[in-house]
């Protein structure tokens, strides 16, 4: 009996302990939900945040003063960090909220005038002339306004494309082919202009042929050691690497090749090239632990000890979106299914390394890419996950600050908070992601997501 009594006491104690543990786990779950801003998503609250920013930007003199004097990394004429980003946000807001913001938008466009008159340094999408053209084209009212200046920009870009790419000695470097600085970004702008400028179509095809030449060359997309951006990369990749990102890697040219076909622009052997290029991305050595590398060491000696963040610049989110574009362009159900499986794998992770709400490597791009993909797949579990990401983003919102969302990065183990306005790393990218989240309209029209080659 004593033994039986002891067993009963032990079992009862274990039961109590289990209940305590369950209660503890429940409390931890509540705390976790609290930590990510677990509030019921109220679309009206999101709209209020967006409308407050519209009101702020509509007071042009005050907004300009605060932005120019308090924003870090402000670069006035660039799409990534300047006035073109404001123009894109207001243009998108005008369509979603059915507001007449034409006069406000025009005032910000006028601020670009002095820079255009004195000459823009470079032709790139994120920091050059095509970025200004991109913003003006999106803001153009049914393609009637700003056409004169757009035609001038188009002509300069077309001339640049032919002059630059007629050089047979071109080296394979991200600054030549990527979205940020290279021809993937310029090509995406030209794709938006093909209906209004025949030469834009010719220049775009020239870019696609350039990509095709790289792909079938001896070293194809290998970026040599001397063309690595950072000294640490020169150490890690002595014989070079293949960049597998969307911002600086092969996903940019591949996405543009797919998008061009989807829009009826093809070069000789386009479909075969797109198939081969997509197959190249799927090489098994480009993956580690079922995730794509950000950069593949050609010597296969360097294996990073970190997990790649699933934002825009790198990560499986970009891989997923690019494969979806290729699948649609080629009408290939296998690629589409693969994209779907990657999407499910992404949402099964916690993605807690996305510490910043901003776009480049943060939650805003994570939300936008997954939300865009789920418009096609329409998976309920993805919709639930998207709501969780929105809550995380909203938890970073500051009502008191002139900058509603800050960019966050780690530096020597400490979180560093920076006030930035621009689309790429600042609050505008976050606000555009939230605007896209609440937008229920058909977005087959040209839109800001084109600049990231998400669409």
From Swiss-Prot:
Q: Superkingdom of the source?
A: Bacteria
Q: Which Pfam families match?
A: LANC_like (PF05147)
What task does this protein carry out? Involved in the post-translational modification of the lantibiotic epidermin.
- Among its keywords, does the record have Iron-sulfur? no
Indicate the family of this protein.
Answer: To B.subtilis SpaC and L.lactis NisC.
State which gene encodes it.
epiC
What's a BP term from Gene Ontology annotated to this protein? Answer: peptide modification
Naturally occurring in which organism (per UniProt): Staphylococcus epidermidis
In Swiss-Prot or TrEMBL terms, this protein is called: Epidermin biosynthesis protein EpiC
Keywords for the protein's UniProt record, in alphabetical order:
Plasmid
Q: Which InterPro entries match?
A: Epidermin_biosynth_EpiC, LanC, LANC-like
- SUPFAM superfamilies per UniProt: LanC-like (SSF158745)
């Amino acid at each position: 009996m004593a033994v039986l009594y002891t067993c009963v006491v032990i079992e009862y104690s274990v039961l109590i302990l289990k209940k305590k543990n369950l209660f503890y786990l429940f409390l931890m779950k509540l705390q976790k939900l609290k930590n990510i801003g677990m509030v019921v998503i109220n679309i009206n609250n999101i709209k209020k945040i967006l409308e407050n920013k519209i009101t702020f930007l509509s007071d042009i003199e005050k907004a300009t003063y605060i932005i120019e004097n308090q924003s870090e990394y402000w670069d006035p004429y660039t799409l990534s960090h300047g006035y073109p980003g404001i123009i894109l946000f207001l243009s998108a807001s005008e369509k979603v909220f059915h507001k007449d913001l034409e006069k406000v938008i025009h005032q910000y466009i006028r601020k670009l005038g002095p820079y255009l008159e004195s000459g823009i340094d470079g032709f790139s999408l994120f920091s050059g002339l095509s970025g200004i053209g991109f913003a003006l084209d999106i803001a153009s009212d049914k393609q009637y306004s700003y056409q004169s200046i757009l035609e001038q920009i188009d002509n300069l870009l077309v001339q640049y494309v032919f002059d630059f790419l007629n050089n047979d000695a071109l080296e394979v470097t991200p600054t030549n082919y990527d979205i940020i600085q290279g021809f993937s970004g310029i090509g995406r702008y030209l794709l938006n202009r093909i209906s209004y400028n025949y030469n834009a179509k010719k220049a775009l095809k020239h870019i696609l042929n350039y990509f095709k030449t790289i792909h079938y060359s001896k070293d194809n997309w290998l970026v040599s050691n001397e063309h690595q951006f950072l000294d640490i990369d020169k150490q890690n990749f002595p014989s070079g690497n293949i960049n597998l990102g969307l911002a600086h890697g092969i996903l940019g040219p591949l996405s543009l090749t797919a998008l061009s076909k989807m829009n009826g622009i093809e070069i000789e052997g386009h479909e075969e090239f797109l198939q081969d290029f997509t197959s190249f991305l799927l090489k098994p050595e480009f993956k580690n632990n079922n995730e794509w590398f950000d950069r593949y060491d050609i010597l296969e000696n360097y294996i990073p000890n970190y997990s790649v963040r699933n934002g825009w610049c790198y990560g499986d989110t970009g891989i997923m979106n690019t494969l979806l574009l290729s699948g649609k362009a080629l009408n290939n159900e296998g690629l589409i299914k693969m994209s779907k499986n990657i999407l499910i794998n992404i949402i099964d992770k916690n993605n807690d390394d996305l510490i910043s709400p901003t776009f480049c490597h943060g939650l805003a791009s994570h939300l936008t890419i997954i939300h865009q993909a789920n418009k096609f797949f329409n998976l309920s579990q993805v919709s639930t996950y998207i709501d969780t990401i929105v809550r995380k983003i909203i938890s970073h919102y500051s009502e008191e600050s002139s900058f509603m969302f800050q960019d966050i990065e780690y530096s020597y183990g400490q979180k560093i908070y920076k006030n930035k306005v621009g689309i790429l790393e600042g609050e505008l990218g976050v606000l555009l992601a939230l605007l896209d989240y609440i937008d229920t309209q058909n977005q087959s029209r040209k839109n800001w997501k084109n600049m990231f080659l998400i669409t």
